[in-house]
C-alpha cells in the first residue's frame, strides 16, 4: 500500500519482498516515508522514517527496561527535540524554511547519542538503531510537505483491514479487484469526493472533470 496526502494505491502482492517495492517505486524521486521495515532500505531515494513508530518503540523499551539510564537519556533528548519540531509544524506547517532551524539540534542529538557509552542492552540497541538510520530520521526538515510520520499509511491500512474482515478469504484475482476499488474509494475520500457519485458519473479518471 502506497499513499501521499491526496492519493492511495493498494498493490496486491504475495509478500513484502524488496523487489516488489522497487518495481512499484521505479523512478520515484520524492521522499519515501515508511516504518523501519528493512526492505525499504533498498529503494534508491531520499527516505524519512516514521518518528511515531520510533517513539512507540522507545516507550515500549522504557516499559521493559525502566532502570536503563542510557535508554532514558536518549528518550528524554529525543522527546524534547520532537516536541519542539512538532510545535513548529503546528504553527507553520511542513515548510523547510521554518523547520530548518531544528537541523542543528537534530544533528546534535544524533551526534550525542553516537558518542554515548551505552552499557545496558536496551540503550545499546537503540543507539545502534539511531546510528543505522541517522540519515533517515530528520530528512523532512529539508523538504516542503514531507511528514515526519506515516499516519496516512496507518489510516489506509486500517481501511484495508476493515475490508478484509468483511470479505474474508478471496482469490488473488479477487484481492486485486478489491485493491483497485479500495484505492479509488480511499483516494476520493482523501480528496473530499463521493465514491458513489464518482462511480455513477462514468468517469475513468478521478481528476477528470472534478476540478480537483
Describe the residue ranges of each PLM region:
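Catalytic center-proximal scaffold of phosphoryl-transfer enzymes
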Residues: 1-212
Amino acid at each position: 500500500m502506497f499513499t501521499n496526502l491526496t492519493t492511495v494505491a493498494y498493490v496486491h502482492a504475495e509478500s513484502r519482498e524488496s523487489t516488489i517495492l522497487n518495481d512499484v517505486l521505479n523512478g520515484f524521486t520524492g521522499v519515501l516515508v515508511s516504518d523501519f521495515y528493512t526492505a525499504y532500505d533498498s529503494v534508491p531515494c531520499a527516505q524519512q522514517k516514521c518518528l511515531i513508530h520510533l517513539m512507540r518503540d522507545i516507550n515500549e523499551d522504557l516499559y521493559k527496561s525502566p532502570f536503563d539510564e542510557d535508554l532514558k537519556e536518549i528518550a528524554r533528548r529525543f522527546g524534547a527535540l520532537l516536541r519542539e519540531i512538532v510545535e513548529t509544524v503546528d504553527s507553520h506547517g511542513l515548510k523547510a524554511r521554518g523547520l530548518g532551524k531544528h537541523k542543528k539540534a537534530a544533528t546534535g542529538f544524533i551526534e550525542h547519542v553516537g558518542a554515548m557509552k551505552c552499557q545496558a542492552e536496551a540503550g545499546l540497541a537503540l543507539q545502534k538503531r539511531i546510528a543505522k538510520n541517522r540519515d533517515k530520521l530528520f530528512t523532512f526538515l529539508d523538504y516542503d510537505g514531507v511528514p515526519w510520520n506515516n499516519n496516512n499509511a496507518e489510516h489506509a491500512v486500517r481501511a484495508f483491514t476493515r475490508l478484509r474482515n468483511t470479505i474474508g478469504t478471496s482469490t488473488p484475482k479477487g484481492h486485486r479487484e478489491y485493491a483497485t476499488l479500495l484505492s479509488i474509494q480511499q483516494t476520493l475520500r482523501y480528496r473530499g469526493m463521493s465514491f458513489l457519485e464518482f462511480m455513477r458519473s462514468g468517469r475513468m479518471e478521478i481528476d477528470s472533470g472534478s476540478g480537483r
